[in-house]
Amino acid sequence: MTSLISITLDELLINEDINDDYTCCVCECLLIEALQCRNGHVACKNCFIKIVKSKKECMTCRCEIKSIESLSKNRYLEKEIRKLNINCPNSFLKRELNLNNNNKNGNGNEGSSANEIEQPQQPQQQQPQELIKDINNGCKEILTIDQLDSHLKQCEYRFLKCTNLYANDLCSELDICGYDYRYNQSEKHRDECPYGIIGCTLCGKDCSRVDIESHTENHCPKLLVKCPTCNQDQLIARCDLDDHLSVDCAMIEIDCILKESGCKERVKRNQLANHLSSDNHLLFINNQFNQQNDIINQLKLELSHCNDLNEILTAKLDRYNNDNTMFRGKWVISNWTDKLNQYPPKKYLSLDFNLSQNKPFSIRVYPNGSSVMWHNCTISLVKLYQTESTIKFSFEIENEDPLKNDLQTKTDIFKGLNDSWSLQFFKVCDQANNNGFIINDTLTINFSIKIKKCFENIFITE
């Protein structure tokens, strides 16, 4: 694309024959920012800036000018100039309007013209200095200078710079496309940009358009290729090639299947059948048969041992299951007020039962506390058999509000005969202050007992 360094508003004018009063008497550019001395002599702002820096006097009447701030704007001239009709700068080549400069030099410094539209220059590249009308693709809009700013923001022909990045394998830096295209050609450039990301049609991987051919030919796992060894007509996906070589390829050399029986030759896969038909393989086959017989016999011995072990474990499991019985019950104690009076501390009510044939237990309730915990209702579980056991048990005292039931659970080792563990219930008091646990002068206890493990009784004689 050919590009210019700058376009001035003067060059965009539809009618170049304009009133001389509309141009600066110094630089002869349009008076986009018209300033005047106290005597009314007009020049553009940038020319007055140069004057203030050097002579500090009006170029026409020589009156003193101390600073730019001492000058006044000529709003009438500015208003009339902004009514002039111009071409859209996008009717030519890429331009950006800069209303803060005012010099035909177009160098972008303080002395540049306010009515220039600057075009970025390519470094170390000479740009042509002529206007080229883009008849086919340029904007056809005719507008006033006053309308220019708002038009440029939405012009369909404005220029954009592509920002697509490319990771070049040859260097660590990212390349940028940087191509200049018109806004209304965005979709076309997106479909053509060499750095644009597209998906591989075979495997779906995202690649830059410039790399897609290399990806397909050299890396795509779904590309159909010929086997480099057998070169068969049937094509294979690149990702399946290793499996083909290790399992199917007819031309790959493999070990004889009787290698473990003594044959050390390697043959091509498609010649294996002929190789196995040779006479000397009868000996190898017999060796393999004997080896497998030995393996079978060994496995039979191991299986028999496993069966014996399984019977032993099954018997132990049955015994464990029998000892691991869960017992649940409910003990309702009425006339609780009388019980509080009848059973002072250390005295208890008892409930005896059998968990199984040889597993008797007793539950003891101390209304006024046991010998250890005084003045609080205490419930104890007593083991009435000799064998040491790990037991999980729980006691739950019902409340008139089921959500407030008091549940306590414990797991511990009960040693010998009459060994016991106790749980204390602090919330259960006399009837006058029972916190909802004494319902109609009745205390209800839910309990569960489970023997988790029984230890063997060992007797030693010396």
UniProtKB/Swiss-Prot annotation:
Location of region: Disordered: 104-127
Pfam families documented for this protein: MATH_2, zf-TRAF
Domain of life: Eukaryota
Alphabetized UniProt keyword annotations: Cytoplasm, Metal-binding, Repeat, Zinc, Zinc-finger
Keyword check for Glycoprotein: no
Zinc finger (TRAF-type): 150-217, 214-273
GO cellular component terms given for this protein: cytoplasm
Residues of the MATH domain: 326-449
Location in the cell: Cytoplasm
Zinc fingers classed as RING-type: ranges: 24-62
Cited SUPFAM superfamilies: RING/U-box (SSF57850), TRAF domain-like (SSF49599)
Family according to the record: Belongs to the TNF receptor-associated factor family. A subfamily.
Function: Probable adapter protein and signal transducer that links members of the tumor necrosis factor receptor family to different signaling pathways by association with the receptor cytoplasmic domain and kinases.
This protein's domain notes: The MATH/TRAF domain binds to receptor cytoplasmic domains.
PANTHER family: RING-TYPE DOMAIN-CONTAINING PROTEIN-RELATED, TNF RECEPTOR ASSOCIATED FACTOR
Protein name: TNF receptor-associated factor family protein DDB_G0267754
